[in-house]
Amino acid sequence: IIRCVKDAQIETETIILEPIASGLSCLNQTQKEEGVLLLDIGGGTSDMVIFYEGNPVFTKVIPIGGKTITRDIATTCNISYEMAETLKTQCGTCIVEKSNKDHHINFPVSGGDSRQISEPYLAEIIFCRINQMLQFVQQTLQKSKYANIVKSVVITGGGAQLKHLEELCR
């Protein structure tokens, strides 16, 4: 990246890792001073960064993102990626108990036909992957020397829009 920027004759002042840049834009100074874990749930990956005493002190890339969840839905339900993304964003939730057990989601499939899945089934697919990611975050935090300094958690990124994610994280 640096070489491409130089080849374009653009002068760089500094290079900042994406999770640190997210933290600098999303967190207030008090959070960064007291100790905060920022979880940025992106499309391909999720990033965690811990700020303490105003500075980033720990970063980790998690190989699970919003696209992973969408692929899980597409594969499990044998539907297109695009339809899986629509189901995730419009009907999905992270907590199975928050889904309507009597509600079935109808959606079109190729050939003009339609299919349906239950709302709890969709929620279970989403929960399994989100739970895996959150366990990874928790294990990574516990293995680090920073577990005791984290006073709060901030979740950002596109994946943070999943319904009931904040409640699940508590």
Q: Which ranges hold each PLM region?
A:
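Residue-level detector of high-confidence beta-strand sites
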Residues: 59-61
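Phosphate/pyrophosphate-binding loops at sites that engage ATP/ADP/AMP, CoA/4′-phosphopantetheine
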Residues: 134, 138-152
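A conserved active-site cap/scaffold subdomain adjacent to cofactor or substrate pockets
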Residues: 63-83
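Residue-level signature of catalytic and energy-coupling elements of molecular machines
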Residues: 5, 40, 73, 137, ...
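Glycine-rich phosphate-binding loops at beta-strand->alpha-helix junctions
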Residues: 95, 149-169
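Nucleotide/phosphate-binding catalytic cleft detector across ATP-hydrolyzing
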Residues: 1-37, 55-56, 77-82, 86-123, ...
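A short acidic Gly-Thr/Ser loop motif
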Residues: 38-45, 51-54, 63-67, 157-160
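Feature representing long, continuous alpha-helical segments
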Residues: 71, 120, 124, 128-135, ...
